[in-house]
């Protein structure tokens, strides 16, 4: 029997199933992912990051950010290794993509961009665009488009972290 190399699709499926199983443990009261990063709507940048579950509230938002990056990097690096790709190049590129993406996602979650009219008073603001925190995806997407078009050499160096799966 020939040694069959794993495809990106199969590795993506395995990683997705692994994360799903970890999340599904919550059904039995075992929360192993409550420390994962949550990007909040904010007016004070110090409130932008938190953990997803208040049971982990002793962990700062920045610690959650770093732990989320480390866990994602480790899991995805295993997948990259299974594909026979260069893990070092992937880790470097993924680190840059992760932090750039999270920075711009956080900017999109600013209350002046994200707060709906009924949330303005909660944040002490008198106006907002009202796009909800999903606006962070739009801001991060725009940043990616700008980087790929204005800095093609940088975009090429980050290609190892931008697999479609």
State where each predicted segment sits.
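Interfacial helix-start motif at the membrane-water boundary
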Residues: 50-69
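Structural signature of multi-pass alpha-helical membrane transport proteins
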Residues: 10-54, 72-84, 91, 95-164
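N-terminal membrane topogenic signal
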Residues: 1-14, 61-62, 89-90
